[in-house]
């Protein structure tokens, strides 16, 4: 299989800019249920990358209409490619599957599936991030998503399960330990609380930096000194 992403990767030290992909990387984010935080996390990732010098495009792949609502509230208008520019973040809302838009070639595309994780079947994204709550009543939704997305978890270059608002050491409830053994390709991460995805604060920035470096490593990157892009 031909690799889709070739990388020039920076050393993962604090204060340095994140690595830049030589070709486009696709990141898919989905939540186990409404309120799991998929949109929050997808926006935060896209804003972090754009703010760090990596061209990123947030793509709304769910039918919630949240992005157009936010753009209207902020009084924004889309450009010729249907993209809104929000606080340094490029956002393309859901226009439907029959609408043809001007093609774009960002370094990273972040696809937000919301809780419509079934739409991810067969999409073949490079990096898969699954957002989940950690309350006991959310367990069944999480198990259902993991079971259904098994092929995607195994075929992605990198797969992550992000628990919302939990510290390291939390292992989930019920069968999560067993699921982790079942999906050895999946890494469990812990997302700190930050209210605004476009302003995650110092703790949020550190989390996003760590997540991005892990994604780069999963996609085949190697720590090396910075080189000028050709």
Residue spans of the language-model regions?
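NTP-binding/hydrolysis catalytic cores, primarily Walker-type P-loop NTPases
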Residues: 199-230
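P-loop/Walker-type NTP enzyme "switch/lid" segment
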Residues: 25-36, 55-124, 189, 193-202
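Hydrophobic positions on the alpha1 helix immediately C-terminal to the Walker A/P-loop
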Residues: 41
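Generic hydrophobic alpha-helical segments
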Residues: 2-6, 97-99, 142-149, 204-207, ...
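Gly/Ala-rich phosphate-binding loop of Rossmann-like dinucleotide-binding domains
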Residues: 46, 50
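Conserved catalytic-core segment of NTP-binding enzymes
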Residues: 4, 105-202
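Solvent-exposed amphipathic alpha-helical surface segments
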Residues: 9-13, 52, 152, 218, ...
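Extreme N-terminal, non-catalytic leader segments
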Residues: 1-26
């Amino acid at each position: 299989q031909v690799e889709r992403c070739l990388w020039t990767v920076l050393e993962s030290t604090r204060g340095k800019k994140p690595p830049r992909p030589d070709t486009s990387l696709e990141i898919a984010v989905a939540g186990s249920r409404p309120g799991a935080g998929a949109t929050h996390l997808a926006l935060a990732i896209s804003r972090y990358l754009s703010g760090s010098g990596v061209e990123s495009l947030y793509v709304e792949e769910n039918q919630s209409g949240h992005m157009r609502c936010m753009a209207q509230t902020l009084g924004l208008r889309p450009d010729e490619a249907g993209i809104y520019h929000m606080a340094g973040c490029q956002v393309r809302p859901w226009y439907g599957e029959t609408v043809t838009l001007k093609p774009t070639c960002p370094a990273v595309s972040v696809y937000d599936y919301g809780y419509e994780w079934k739409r991810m079947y067969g999409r073949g994204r490079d990096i898969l991030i699954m957002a989940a709550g950690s309350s006991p009543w959310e367990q069944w939704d999480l198990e259902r998503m993991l079971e259904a997305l098994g092929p995607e978890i195994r075929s992605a270059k990198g797969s992550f399960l992000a628990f919302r608002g939990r510290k390291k050491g939390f292992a989930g409830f019920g069968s999560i330990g067993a699921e982790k053994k079942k999906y050895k390709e999946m890494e469990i991460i812990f997302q700190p609380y930050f209210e605004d995805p476009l302003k995650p604060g110092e703790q949020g920035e550190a989390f996003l930096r760590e997540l991005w470096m892990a994604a780069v490593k999963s996609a085949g990157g190697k720590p090396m000194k910075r080189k000028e892009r050709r």
